[in-house]
């Protein structure tokens, strides 16, 4: 999916969070497009049979790399939320010619003993009990209508914090007809597999293949994920290019305009003088 603009010399390749198709970020995309950027995004990462979900996500990384090769004539800013941030940094490390910068939205880099603990948990299967995948594999999938799905999610604590327009966009992008009902289009088993195969090796990859472009980070002030992972590696890799937005791990959905504006500020600061 690409959103066109009158200027085509500035490109954002955006990668979504797990379980949230790219269309869920419509308000961000429109803001960036209005500022003169061309926005490209895979609609649902991990759903193409050629790119299966495996440990440390090498095929998902390649899905992003091949998408950039097809869609963008030259390097782009790789902006990603959660899952998308990790894939962006892995793609930039693998193919530095495709990235002029990486911006992580609440994707703190795991390192040290926490990375080793995750590796052990994955190898033994113990991690599945504590992974978000434990919840996602039991998630309801079908509703009588899209409106019924909206009403269901609107009262859930996580989704109740969303900007109402973003929740509508999530329903529009995340539901599809399934016989007489509507079902989640982001397949539950793929979402669960992504959670259960989180990369434990990113810090090691970046030691062997340091990024050839700037990296920046925007996090949610109340992000549980940031508290769990810590910021030590991210602060080092970003050379202090860190900002915060009030909100949880899903702050792009909670504060879409502020998020879109802050992303552009970070990108503009990193651009060379014209």
Predicted regions and their residues:
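Conserved HGGG/HGGXW glycine-rich cap/lid loop of the alpha/beta-hydrolase fold
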Residues: 6-49, 67
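Flexible "cap/lid" loop of the alpha/beta hydrolase fold
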Residues: 100-142, 227
């Amino acid at each position: 999916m690409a959103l066109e603009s009158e200027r085509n010399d500035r490109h954002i390749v955006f990668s979504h969070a797990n379980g949230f198709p790219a269309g869920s970020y419509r308000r961000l995309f429109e803001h960036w497009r209005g500022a003169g950027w061309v926005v490209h995004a895979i609609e649902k990462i991990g759903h193409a049979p050629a790119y299966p979900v495996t440990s440390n996500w090498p095929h998902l990384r390649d899905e992003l790399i091949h998408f950039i090769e097809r869609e963008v004539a030259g390097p782009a800013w790789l902006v990603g939320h959660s899952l998308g941030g990790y894939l962006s940094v892995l793609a930039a490390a693998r193919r530095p010619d495709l990235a002029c910068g990486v911006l992580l939205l609440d994707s703190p880099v795991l390192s040290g003993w926490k990375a080793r603990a995750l590796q052990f948990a994955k190898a033994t299967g113990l991690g599945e009990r504590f992974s978000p995948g434990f919840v996602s594999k039991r998630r309801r999938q079908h509703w009588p209508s899209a409106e019924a799905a909206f009403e269901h999610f609107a009262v859930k604590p996580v989704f109740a914090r969303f900007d109402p327009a973003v929740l509508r966009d999530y329903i529009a992008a995340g539901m599809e007809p399934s016989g007489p009902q509507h079902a989640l289009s982001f397949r539950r088993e793929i979402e669960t597999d992504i959670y259960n195969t989180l990369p434990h090796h990113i810090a090691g990859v970046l030691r062997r293949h340091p990024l050839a472009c700037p990296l920046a980070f925007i996090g949610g002030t109340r992000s549980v994920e940031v508290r769990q992972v810590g910021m030590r590696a991210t602060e080092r890799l970003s050379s202090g290019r860190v900002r915060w937005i009030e909100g949880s791990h899903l702050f792009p959905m909670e504060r879409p305009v502020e998020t879109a504006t802050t992303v552009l500020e970070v990108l503009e600061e990193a651009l060379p003088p014209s």
